[in-house]
Amino acid sequence: VAGTNPLVALFSTVSLGFMAAAFGGRPGVMSGASGACSVVVAALAASHGTGYLSACVILAGMLQCLSGALDLGKFIRLVPHPVMLGFVNGLAVVMTRAQLSHFMDGSGKLLLNTQGYIMWGLTALTMALIKLIPKVTTKLPPSLGAIFVVGSLVKLLKIPAVTLASIAGADTFTGGLSVIPKLRLPAVPVSLATLKTIFPYAAVMAAVGLIESLLTVQLVDGMLDDGKKGSTKKECIGQGIGNIFSGILGGQGGCALVGQSIINVESGG
């Protein structure tokens, strides 16, 4: 979505996730490259290149750190519970619709052929394992266990399943570690014109990222009955540091992720 190499996006998730977890305000919250943030900066990346994208991410991180220093995150508690439920349910609908496209052909019709039946079957098996694994052991995250079992079956039995390479292209991950950018400031002119170009995108990205992150903190607070409340101030600063670090590495930034945080908490993370 943001116009970066998939490996860069993955590394961006690793760097952002590590820094946000280290400096954030709530254990259990998972952060990474976010579709919501990527949509905001996609136009900037397309028109000015990835250098301006990285500069935008760094500036967004600075704005998030400033929001944390001013303790602006506390206002997220004014969001009523029904709004938070609508946010989570809406996200579930969006995620489901995004996944359903992989079960359709080019004309938008469901795949009702051999390939489709294999995909439906593997999906059903994965969902069943996610429910069954916790009944057998609690030491293995059910989602990870299901992926490992189903992936192993596909490999061992040579099941002709659709893979990421077959959808995105065989050369999607070509380049390996050499594709990952080095730690350096983005190569953009340090001028008022550059600031005028990236500031509107950075401000929106910072706001969208903090809203999703702080709502995720509230959601995790409700799921974990440990008597603790996440610190909105620390979460703002943690997200900001994560985005600054991600931008310096040439990443696309991101925020806390509701779906991944739910999976993490339910898996005992």
What are the roles of these predicted feature ranges?
Residues 1-269:
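Transmembrane helical cores of multi-pass ion-transport proteins
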